[in-house]
Amino acid sequence: MNAKVFNPSIITKEQIAGLHFPSQEVLVLPNEIKQRRKNAQEGLLLGNRYKAKVRIVFEDTETLKQVEATIWGLTDLHVILKKGTTIPMHRIYTIDICP
């Protein structure tokens, strides 16, 4: 599935806690996975320094979703948003800096 072809549902970060995530990786190509990690790290730096928000497109068990939030932390497996809300890294299609 190419996330850029579909229109994701826009949600708030508070809604993420009630979502369920499958264990399958959404990206296929190794370079896409590497770029996602790089974008997450850039988002973390901008979030910590300037409180800049990113647009994250991800997929839970139901549909493609989009949230705009500040990245507060990263682990190998998760992107951490404000108030400890997490999104599994393997379910994220794109992370872009908000204009």
Where are the regions a protein language model picked out?
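Short coil-to-beta-strand transition motifs
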Residues: 60-67, 85-88
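Short glycine-rich, low-complexity segments
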Residues: 1-63, 95-99
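Short, Lys/Arg-rich amphipathic alpha-helical interaction segments
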Residues: 72, 76-99
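Short, compositionally biased strand/turn segments
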Residues: 49-50, 63-76
